Amino acid sequence: MKRSTLILLTTALLVLAALSWWYRPWTPYSPSVMTRLLHPEYRLQNFRQMEKVFPFRVIPASSEPFSFPRGEASLPEQFIHDGRVIDTAEFMLRTQTTGLMVLHQGTNVFEQYYLEATREDRFTSWSVAKSVIGTLTAIALKDGHIASLDDPVKQYVSELDGAAWGEVPIRDLLRMASGIQFSEVYDEKFSDINMLFYRTFLLGEGVRDVIADLPAARPPGEIFHYVSPNTQILGWVLERATGKPIAEYAAEALWQPLGMQDEAIWSLDQGGVELGFCCLNMTLRDYSKLGQLYLQQGVWQDRQLLPEGWVEQASRRPEPWLAAGNGYPERGYGYHLWVPKDPDQEFFFNGVWGQTVWVSEKHNVVVAKTSVDPLFRQHMAEVISFMRAVSEFVAAAGEKNNRG
């Protein structure tokens, strides 16, 4: 065989191998799909159809679906943020809102979809899933699957005995105080969080394998350090404590009793493990039910789903290092939920790209907002101002209507 022919054949084989790796027809994790996930041209569609991006496990709709009674309310035309008047319509467009739903006193008073989204769409949660994991942890505690929040991880996940994770109490996973060394900086190409995505989504490694041997930077329970592996480990504890995959336990403990109207899906790694720190996909109406459960102090249709006092414990932490200003100027943290600066009986679930479920106990309001906002960090304080304005406006309108 001539040298030139051999070189040509070798080159062709290398190109074929590269194309095969890039498109990977034998696996659901295709780099060609992964690299388009966040691309401006595709993300609007991807965030509403993640079943075409990742493998998943189904969470069936409840056999007894619940619909909120309907009412009618408008949004404030303007709101104040940082001393400036913000036009609501402009804000909704600028933050690339795909859905907005407002509940007042358990009534659906506003529901609207944008950017071609519909009520049937399953919107991806990103880190709102963390609050769902926190909620499931509370239910597992109430039902006796978890004995105490002070139990160490190794008591439930024997594989982590001897690892830095093993000695971390469940409580410190919930309040993001594990002490584990990890960088959750999305803007740095090779940060730990981006390498977690690369290794799990592109290289096909199991998510647990990627994070199991992370080292400790400090003892647990000393400072707030928000990192996604805390939630992934918490999900591992949940699976072992309940004896069920996370999605299956969510179906039994949350979806069925809450009367979730629509099927949800939870994205998986290649080994079939739920990506607990992100990637739950559900409809806007069902997102709002999660907020309403917390507004009702964990009670749903006369059934106490969360431990008594859980909502107060989760949203009103006494630790000064969990307050706003410890890593995030406009918000602090609780048990896997966020608390705005200077809270007035309010807290929220939040995910990147602008996913928010807001709960105002003072105004008896829940606001659920889904988005594809690339400037979500820059807009965070403004989103809080918007949520507060909507809560106050809707509550005031309701009181006015009640007075006749």
Where are the regions a protein language model picked out?
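N-terminal leader/targeting segments and the immediately adjacent pre-domain N-terminus
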Residues: K2-T118, I146, A212, A389-G404
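Active-site helix/loop module of the DD-peptidase/beta-lactamase fold
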Residues: D143-Q181, D213, A241-C278, M282
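Active-site-proximal alpha-helical segments within enzyme catalytic domains
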Residues: N230-V237, G276-V299, Q355-S371
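Active-site Gly/Thr loop motif
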Residues: Q261-A264, E312-V366
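Extended ligand-binding groove/face enriched in aromatic
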Residues: Q96, T124, L160-V207
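Catalytic-site signature segments of enzymes, centered on catalytic residues
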Residues: R119-E120, D187, N194-G271, C278
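Non-transmembrane alpha-helical segments in soluble domains
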Residues: A89, A138, K154, R171-L174, ...
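Active-site SXXK
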Residues: G106, T124-L149, L173, L234-L238, ...
